[in-house]
Amino acid sequence: MNPSPLLDLIDSPQDLRRLDKKQLPRLAGELRTFLLESVGQTGGHFASNLGAVELTIALHYVYDTPEDKLVWDVGHQSYPHKILTGRKNQMHTMRQYGGLAGFPKRCESEYDAFGVGHSSTSIGAALGMAAADKLLGSDRRSVAIIGDGAMTAGQAFEALNCAGDMDVDLLVVLNDNEMSISPNVGALPKYLASNVVRDMHGLLSTVKAQTGKVLDKIPGAMEFAQKVEHKIKTLAEEAEHAKQSLSLFENFGFRYTGPVDGHNVENLVDVLKDLRSRKGPQLLHVITKKGNGYKLAENDPVKYHAVANLPKESAAQMPSEKEPKPAAKPTYTQVFGKWLCDRAAADSRLVAITPAMREGSGLVEFEQRFPDRYFDVGIAEQHAVTFAGGLACEGMKPVVAIYSTFLQRAYDQLVHDIALQNLPVLFAVDRAGIVGADGPTHAGLYDLSFLRCVPNMIVAAPSDENECRLLLSTCYQADAPAAVRYPRGTGTGAPVSDGMETVEIGKGIIRREGEKTAFIAFGSMVAPALAVAEKLNATVADMRFVKPIDEELIVRLARSHDRIVTLEENAEQGGAGGAVLEVLAKHGICKPVLLLGVADTVTGHGDPKKLLDDLGLSAEAVERRVRAWLSDRDAAN
């Protein structure tokens, strides 16, 4: 680690406030260097944090945290906040099992005012805190820090609309770096970008009036000044929109300040001190650069949004001399991306929709090959789903590529706008199940439960990569709303067909014949079920579909076996195991059933294999649980 004499003095914001304001730029440099080194070792969100260093220092320098509340939106940019609030020596554990969470977490620190992981929640949460303080007679201040990408979500504007009508002391800091994870899309980011240059017409008139007479007396000066004036007028035409930023937020009832350089920490301190003394809703528009201070991240903030590990800058810029690695087995996301392009090449009706997750959802190639049929709607999951419904009404075949955890945000639209109207929209539900380092806010553990109760829905869960392609093709051709949910990362390594074969909807398949015990497995749990079944001589059914579920297969297995074990990487409550129990009850079958899924708990973060073992869903844990269950039953009999 590089020496950091100022940063080493800081264990809390109280220590930070003892520094002279002129020392803060140096502190920012030390903090940024520390970030480069710590994230380089552990991995994690990177470019967003580099861009928020000065802003974080200034906020903690001015505001009396933890008494005053800082509410970070999404949390990608919260690492400097964690470093300054007593967690610097734990940063090497970031996103690791038993270590620091990658996002603000209330149970981790009193400085983490609100837990977060999804976008656009900060203004509403900070507004609630400000309203509570008013009712309690407290003079605490609440601050929401939100990126311009998160401002594309309707929830942010719902909160702005509400806040402007309430007499509360609230500061919203708009951290404008023209990025979310991918480049921002939509009218609002363009609107904000047009307002970075301030209105210069008044300034130009003043300069001309004051200096015109002097310039007339200097040979050649007037001609030069006229050229400068032309350049300024060109900028001024764009800057006419600057007044609109003020108008936009002031029409919501906020007093607008900005844009302000988000990397000038001393000026930020002065501005924030002024804003802290003001009453009522305030909005500070700060301009930052994602990846600031690390050229590779500045030049490619999408690639460096999050990193597994960080090469030295000099090494990263050199051509690799290593032998190319053999091609790894494809991830489920890559299987989906290839299927989508193959299907689109054969069907001009196919359109793809993503809520600001082009890279993560595997849509980069699709956008390049079919730009007219690609729609990135921004961080707007609700709109994405209803938009897909409108496309389906006119004969298009929409495919919504979305993470399981983000589909939760559009549940009403899925029910009201898609399912009740039986519109043929396919949801490619990525990151189903445990996701690892991102933790509980990003885990996809509830989709089977909340999808299978929705009328008209088809819900499928592939057990390997080829099954993923089969089920995508099958559900795409269904004249009904459908969801195919698949996990993060790679699968079993099954060879993937290039064809568009389909399977019968609502029918499972026996993967292994055994005796006495039947494993009824869904999706990613088929592989561990097969591993355990080899040791216990059990039958394994790959159900493929959670809805419609294969009642005939379940009844046949129940009548030909002594006991049943269901396995799913989803919440036990309301999940696929519950669907099996419903079938047994419907047919009056009473057999011992062991449900294996995620218990009613908040999961942790870290290595997915370790998390699955803790949840009792790794192959080793499944074997232990099943053997213990069988032993208990034998003892009882």
UniProtKB/Swiss-Prot annotation:
Catalytic activities: D-glyceraldehyde 3-phosphate + pyruvate + H(+) = 1-deoxy-D-xylulose 5-phosphate + CO2
Enzyme class: transferase
Pathway membership: Metabolic intermediate biosynthesis; 1-deoxy-D-xylulose 5-phosphate biosynthesis; 1-deoxy-D-xylulose 5-phosphate from D-glyceraldehyde 3-phosphate and pyruvate: step 1/1
Keyword Magnesium: yes
PROSITE patterns: TRANSKETOLASE_1, TRANSKETOLASE_2
Cofactor descriptive note: Binds 1 Mg(2+) ion per subunit. Binds 1 thiamine pyrophosphate per subunit.
EC number: 2.2.1.7
Signal peptide: none
Any Pfam family: Transket_pyr
Cofactor(s), by name: Mg(2+); thiamine diphosphate
InterPro entries membership: Dxylulose-5-P_synthase, THDP-binding, Transketo_C/PFOR_II, Transketolase-like_Pyr-bd, Transketolase_BS, Transketolase_C, Transketolase_CS
SUPFAM superfamilies the UniProt entry points to: Thiamin diphosphate-binding fold (THDP-binding) (SSF52518), TK C-terminal domain-like (SSF52922)
SMART domains, per the entry: Transket_pyr
A GO BP annotation: 1-deoxy-D-xylulose 5-phosphate biosynthetic process
Magnesium found in the keyword field: yes
Binding-site residues, Mg(2+): D148, N177
NCBIfam families: dxs, PRK05444.2-2
Function: Catalyzes the acyloin condensation reaction between C atoms 2 and 3 of pyruvate and glyceraldehyde 3-phosphate to yield 1-deoxy-D-xylulose-5-phosphate (DXP).
Family, per entry: Belongs to the transketolase family. DXPS subfamily.
PANTHER family reported in the protein's UniProt record: 1-D-DEOXYXYLULOSE 5-PHOSPHATE SYNTHASE-RELATED, 1-DEOXY-D-XYLULOSE-5-PHOSPHATE SYNTHASE, CHLOROPLASTIC
UniProt subunit comment: Homodimer.
Protein name: 1-deoxy-D-xylulose-5-phosphate synthase
Originating species: Neisseria meningitidis serogroup B (strain ATCC BAA-335 / MC58)
Lineage of the species this protein comes from: Bacteria, Pseudomonadati, Pseudomonadota, Betaproteobacteria, Neisseriales
Gene behind the chain: dxs
